[in-house]
UniProtKB/Swiss-Prot annotation:
It is a multi-pass membrane protein. It comes from the Bacteria. It is found in: Cell inner membrane. The chain crosses the membrane at residues 19-39, 81-101. Keywords: Cell inner membrane, Cell membrane, Ion channel, Ion transport, Membrane, Transmembrane, Transmembrane helix, Transport. Pfam families: MscL. The gene is mscL. The keyword Lipid biosynthesis does not apply. NCBIfam families: mscL, PRK00567.1-4, PRK13952.1. This is Large-conductance mechanosensitive channel.
């Protein structure tokens, strides 16, 4: 049973999938940092220093806090600023993955589009070509 599991786990597709998941998780952290530390501060500066992560709408009259963390402690809130940040994060990840897949597809197309060198004719094909040429010229072969 262990041997079967080892053979299954070492197949190319399973190993490739595992590597992809690990790289994807690391890539997700990079993109999250890009959104939180680079893009959202720029958007905040453009909009006058607004921090979208603290945008919320109270769903209860008991919520009187000015920050999302405090408001969640007081009652139900609709944290649409966090949702906006996560949506932007998703769109950036999807766009970057689109660019990667697009580049990979272009590389594959270039490899597929490269014409293969013509195959060398076999001895039979060479003999047939000689016979064809003799018949076209109308002359008799010399023995």
């Amino acid at each position: 049973m262990f041997k079967e599991f080892r053979e299954f786990a070492m197949k190319g597709n399973v190993v490739d999938l595992a590597v992809g998941v690990i790289i994807g998780a690391a890539f997700g952290g990079i993109v999250s940092s890009l959104v939180a530390d680079v893009i959202m501060p720029i958007i905040g500066a453009i909009t006058g220093g607004l921090d979208f992560s603290n945008y919320f709408t109270p769903l209860s009259k008991a919520v009187t806090a000015n920050t999302l963390v405090e408001a969640k402690k007081q009652g139900a809130v609709l944290a649409w600023g966090s949702f906006l940040t996560l949506t932007l994060n998703f769109l950036i990840v999807a766009f970057v993955l689109f660019l990667v897949v697009r580049a990979m597809n272009r590389l594959k197309r270039k490899d597929e589009a490269a014409p293969a060198p013509p195959a060398k004719p076999t001895p039979e094909q060479e003999l047939l070509a000689e016979i064809r040429d003799i018949l076209k010229s109308g002359s008799r072969p010399q023995a």
